From Swiss-Prot:
Organism, scientific name: Bos taurus
Top-level taxon of origin: Eukaryota
Gene: BOLA1
Annotated protein name in UniProt: BolA-like protein 1
Entry function: Acts as a mitochondrial iron-sulfur (Fe-S) cluster assembly factor that facilitates (Fe-S) cluster insertion into a subset of mitochondrial proteins. Probably acts together with the monothiol glutaredoxin GLRX5. May protect cells against oxidative stress.
Region Disordered: start-end pairs: 114-135
Similarity-based family: Belongs to the BolA/IbaG family.
Modified residues (Phosphoserine): 81
InterPro entries documented for this protein: BolA, BolA-like_sf, BolA/IbaG_stress_morph_reg
PANTHER family referenced in this protein's UniProt entry, alphabetically: BOLA TRANSCRIPTION REGULATOR (PTHR46229), BOLA-LIKE PROTEIN 1 (PTHR46229:SF2)
GO annotations of cellular component type: mitochondrion
Pfam families noted in UniProt: BolA
Keywords, alphabetical: Mitochondrion, Phosphoprotein
Record's subunit section: Interacts with GLRX5.
Length: 135
């Protein structure tokens, strides 16, 4: 029989995969997204890892994996500043950030912070790389 904590973790993992697949638009997790997920899980042992491929909302070819938003909840972030937390995420993803990933929005929180506000932020609409506002 599964323990309650394991069941919650399995349910959480399943919902993250569904969220990730639904947000990518194609229903398929690509190799870059899979690599990001694996590397963050290995480096930070997160309690929560929500990953959203936001490439479809930008001026890139269909199926691209260039723009991501991630929420990482880990006890490894305890006592660290936001900058130090982001550096840990960047270190884990150095290969992806040097290559295929153009933009990575990071929410790096402790378990207590996530408990207060357990949601992934939304990104603003893409302006196509220009700083002009849309009419």
């Amino acid at each position: 029989m599964l323990s309650g904590q394991l069941v919650v973790r399995l349910f959480s993992m399943a919902s993250r995969v569904c969220m990730s697949r639904g947000s990518a638009g194609s229903g398929v997790i690509g190799p870059v997204e899979a690599a990001i997920r694996t590397k963050l899980e290995q480096a930070l042992n997160p309690e929560v890892l929500e990953l959203r491929n936001e490439s479809g909302g930008h001026a890139v070819p269909p199926g691209s994996e260039t723009h991501f938003r991630v929420a990482v909840v880990s006890s490894r972030f305890e006592g660290l500043s936001p900058l130090q937390r982001h550096r840990l995420v960047h270190a884990a993803l150095s290969e992806e950030l040097a290559g295929p990933v153009h933009a990575l929005a990071i929410q790096a929180r402790t378990p207590a912070q996530w408990k207060e506000n357990p949601q992934l932020d939304t990104s603003p609409a893409c302006l196509g790389g220009s700083k002009k506002s849309r009419n």
